[in-house]
Swiss-Prot record:
It is an enzyme of class 2 (transferase). It comes from Cucurbita moschata (Winter crookneck squash). It catalyses: a fatty acyl-[ACP] + sn-glycerol 3-phosphate = a 1-acyl-sn-glycero-3-phosphate + holo-[ACP]; sn-glycerol 3-phosphate + an acyl-CoA = a 1-acyl-sn-glycero-3-phosphate + CoA. This is Glycerol-3-phosphate acyltransferase ATS11, chloroplastic. Pathway: Phospholipid metabolism; CDP-diacylglycerol biosynthesis; CDP-diacylglycerol from sn-glycerol 3-phosphate: step 1/3. The lineage of its organism: Eukaryota, Viridiplantae, Streptophyta, Embryophyta, Tracheophyta. Transmembrane segments: none annotated. Its EC number is 2.3.1.15, 2.3.1.n5. SUPFAM superfamilies: Glycerol-3-phosphate (1)-acyltransferase. Pfam families: Acyltransferase, GPAT_N.
Amino acid sequence: MFILSSSSSLPSPLSLSSSRVSLPPPSSSSLNLLPLSPHFQPPNLACSCSVASRSTAELLHDFKHSAHTAASADEARNHLPHSRAFLDVRSEQELLSYIRREAEAGKLPSNVAAGMEELYQNYKNAVLKSGNPKADEIVLSNMTVALDRILLDVEEPFVFSPHHKAVREPFDYYTFGQNYVRPLIDFGNSFVGNPFLFKDIEEKLHQGHNVVLISNHQTEADPAIISLLLEKTSPYIAENMIYVAGDRVIVDPLCKPFSIGRNLICVYSKKHMFDIPELAETKRKANTRSLKEMALLLRGGSQLIWIAPSGGRDRLDPSSGEWLPAPFDASSMDNMRRLIQHSGVPGHLCPLALLCYDIMPPPSKVEIEIGEKRVISFNGVGLSLAPAISFEAIAATHRNPDEAREAYSKALFDSVSMQYNVLKAAIYGRQALRASTADVSLSQPWI
């Protein structure tokens, strides 16, 4: 329900002028970040093609104006009266009945109402499988709040800025997301690899360094899962991480309330670049703003950014029948490295492995329409971090710059894959802590 990282094309050469930022031209490919217009509104879900009629100019409002507009819209929605009947329901029957009444009254698009019902049933089934004696109570409590927030956003859509900061008050969207995903995790069969390295990262952040986590990406719930696995030992990291997020999770009504609770850099996804062909070039040109926003953040130091250079979620390999990390895009990696290098403060790129696909697996293929089916399960998950990998050390063994970039991307990907296999052995191989290796020390800090 949350994050979809992205990749796309960058105009080249690129020059960003600012009193604080000066960047060299990126490589011939891309960093792959494409910002959303701050005024981008969800398409009419009754017709997935309706967004095509939207003027391209609407996607490119001035950034300064956008920041003010987003703040004003957020302030207005917090004082806007909206139907709160979801919070008053006391049973499943009342909840489902209210969804149907809202749809019949025209307050909910029919497909959003259907998505709400499907989400409720799938969430209920997953939590019941946990064996928690309070499962029914947990389901009703969490789903009433979730549906209340979804309905609020349908009535008064939230507007994301290119750099969105998690909304913690007057309603705490971060805690809401944590509480919603928590019952889906089998903590008895979940693991964190090398937790001491997260402590090292936190120390570097407090020293003013930047850290970029180069990760695979498995589900929309990745940010909540990462935060839940770190909340006991590294709450600062859990709450302050910035995620590079694709446009769909800030447009889909069932995703938006969860995305509101995360720190995001909002981008357009390469996989959806040509969904509306006439907007493709506009999206590419808009990339300058997103680059500038990230560059400004990194220039200030103490930033922790999560990015998936694969450009999307890992998907089931039809030949092997396994979920494996999707390959990284070397040009994306190189441009991220160059942003760090030219930020003016120390920076580190660290490989992070995430295994959680069973919690909320993506569709088997990339879909154009907004509103994918949400399959939800109760399962163990895993997270593992490895030390930063130095580009200079790898480049020293390659005379050809292109070969050095490819080798660096491969080194990061190989580390993620290695850690992923350890997590897989622990969770699905039932080896638990015995799956630890010389490079990955597994722990369960919540026990």
